[in-house]
């Protein structure tokens, strides 16, 4: 009753995924600014404590670096939005649901998409959505299961990364504050010493707040999706196209947020998340 898992491996859809992967790769190249910010946050305050005569210079450099960091954020936002539109083209054409031109604006043109796809030489994009989404399922149910995968997969990753960032921020600034108190360092000097780490603080707080909001939104939408699946399990009621489009709107909006989890963190639990996704789909199908 649906051919989603078969059609997703057609050349057209693989090309979309290749283009999207390149765009996000271009975006994530600028995560080097995040890494540098973290290293600066660790090294520069220590240098300031060891060499008091360069504290003012370190503080000025910290402010300058923060400005550079914020400028790169604008580039990342644009690339993230481009990647989100390509992924939206993949989903809407695969699911055969309407494009929301009001929300998503224009599609990425074919020339740009083809040029991007040519840059990808990997072969790891088959079976984007779980093969546990059987062809016997009604098409609206198959679509909403795919949409559920988007929420469930990213929700777990975001929870882990927020916890990691909070521990990192509290530990880092806790150590320095304890040191400053122990050494009876004045408030103005503390500000000068911490100034080089401002970009790191912005990165950590910005991501924690943004990802926490996404977690809340994803949990709420996930509950609504499960209610729809429960209705189907009880009386075979399927969602209409309008409901599917509304859920897709939420997915698109959250994909446009530039605070992305680093690749190295994503890869740590990739295989575990894939197995977890398959098991969740299997569990849901037992209710049908």
Model-derived features: where do they sit?
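Membrane-proximal, non-transmembrane interface segments of integral membrane proteins
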Residues: 81-161
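Membrane-interface, cytosolic juxtamembrane amphipathic helix immediately N-terminal to a transmembrane helix
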Residues: 12-32, 144-167
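Inner-leaflet juxtamembrane helices
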Residues: 69-101, 204-228
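Alpha-helical transmembrane segments and their immediate juxtamembrane boundary regions
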Residues: 27-78, 159-216
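Amphipathic, well-ordered alpha-helical segments in soluble domains
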Residues: 147-150, 173, 221-224
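Short N-terminal secondary-structure initiator segments
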Residues: 1-16, 61-70, 133-155
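Cytosolic/matrix-facing juxtamembrane and C-terminal tails of multi-pass cellular membrane proteins
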Residues: 2-13, 17, 22, 209-287
């Amino acid at each position: 009753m649906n051919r989603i898992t078969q059609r997703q491996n057609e050349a057209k859809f693989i090309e979309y995924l290749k283009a999207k992967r390149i765009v996000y790769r271009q975006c994530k190249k600028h995560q080097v600014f995040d890494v540098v910010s973290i290293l600066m946050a660790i090294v520069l305050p220590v240098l300031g404590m060891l060499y008091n005569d360069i504290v003012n210079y370190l503080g000025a450099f910290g402010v300058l670096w923060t400005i550079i960091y914020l400028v790169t954020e604008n580039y990342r936002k644009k690339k993230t939005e481009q990647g989100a539109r390509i992924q939206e083209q993949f989903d809407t054409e695969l699911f055969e649901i309407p494009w929301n031109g009001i929300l998503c604006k224009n599609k990425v043109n074919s020339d740009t998409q083809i040029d991007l796809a040519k840059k990808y030489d990997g072969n790891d994009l088959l079976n984007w959505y779980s093969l546990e989404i059987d062809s016997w399922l009604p098409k609206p149910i198959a679509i909403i299961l795919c949409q559920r995968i988007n929420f469930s997969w990213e929700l777990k990753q975001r929870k882990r990364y927020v916890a990691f960032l909070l521990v990192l921020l509290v530990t880092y600034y806790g150590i320095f504050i304890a040191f400053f108190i122990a050494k009876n360092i004045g408030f103005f000097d503390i500000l000068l010493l911490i100034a080089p780490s401002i970009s790191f603080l912005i990165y950590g707080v910005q991501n924690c707040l943004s990802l926490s909001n996404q977690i809340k939104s994803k949990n709420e939408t996930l509950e609504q999706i499960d209610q729809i699946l429960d209705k189907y399990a009880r009386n075979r009621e399927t969602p209409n196209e309008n409901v599917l489009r509304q859920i897709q709107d939420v997915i698109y909006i959250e994909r446009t947020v530039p605070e992305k989890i680093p690749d190295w963190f994503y890869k740590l639990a990739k295989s575990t998340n894939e197995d977890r996704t398959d098991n969740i789909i299997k569990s849901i199908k037992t209710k049908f």
